[in-house]
Amino acid sequence: MAEVSSKRRKRTKTDIGCQSSAIKKIKEMFDAVMPEDFYDFWAFCEELNPKNPEDALMDTMGLQLVGPYDVLTGKLDGLSESSYHLHWRYYYDPPEFMTVIRGNEDQGFHIGYYRDEPQALPVFVASNKAKVSCEMSVIGENLFSALNTCITENLKKIKDKSQQSSLKKMQTSLITKAKELQYSLATTTPAIKARNKKVNSKTLHKAGIVVPVNAMDVGYRPLTVTDAELKKMLKTITESENKSAKDKASDELQELLTFVQFANDEGDYGMGLELGLDLFCFGSKQFHNTILQLLPLAYQLLGREKYAKIIQEHLENRDREKLSEAS
């Protein structure tokens, strides 16, 4: 989130004392630079629960800080390198998404950063209910706005006066801290709107993809089917008992794969990325081999090698029951 607010906030002593060490360790483990709000949000949670900051939101919101936050708690000490990108990676999480907060286990609710480019700062914070669907909801530009969005939504549903009071108290503290640090609490900001204009396709997960397109309009070409048509095609392949219909749908998918090959030859790498992510979001293991034909290559062609590695690791371990890789 390069554009956190209209004003460049001044660094304060609320930042973690060992932040430089944490930054280095997270970079080594996750190959990612975390935005400032990641550390400031930890400091905010430390104020709420000095002993266990990761559990500061548990009683009121049922949320726990996880993922790279586990570096700060020491939970990832001794973890094998191959496991870092699987740590709290849910079933429908694309490589662009990194979980930092987990919630309702019944629905698989979790919150994380979304990056278009692996080495860039996140473009927004999103949430997903992994046991409900692949769709992601943009809930803010930083973790303060994301939590504020969650609190506001919870206040609409909760009738218990005591719970409402606790939520309002936390929201007041959150708003005060966000204003102090000059973080926007808006769900949609100018930076997010600007990014939306660059989105080539929303994809089935709705967070969208952004790939560079040059002045000659080379870089992306749309799929030749709509989302609805693609889902119908994939559903026919996986569920239909009619062999003729199944074969027809399989031929249609093969045609799409051929179009992607043509697109790659002509520099439109975004088409393979879109189709690969849509197959991933559909969720059937039947398409895992096809996804492996599409996504690693698309990411490599786009210079996003880290994402190629993540999708391969994820598909190999997608059905695992234990999402935490910590011992």
Curated annotation (Swiss-Prot):
Keywords: Chromosome, Nucleus
UniProt GO cellular component terms: chromosome; nucleus
Localization per Swiss-Prot or TrEMBL: Chromosome; Nucleus
One Gene Ontology term of the molecular function aspect: histone binding
Biological process terms in GO annotation: DNA repair-dependent chromatin remodeling; double-strand break repair
Source species, domain of life: Eukaryota
Residues of the active site: 266
InterPro entries, sorted: HPF1
Function in brief: Cofactor for serine ADP-ribosylation that confers serine specificity on PARP. Switches the amino acid specificity of PARP from aspartate or glutamate to serine residues. Acts by completing the active site of PARP: forms a composite active site composed of residues from HPF1 and PARP.
Family per record: Belongs to the HPF1 family.
Protein name as annotated: Histone PARylation factor 1
Species annotation: Nematostella vectensis (Starlet sea anemone)
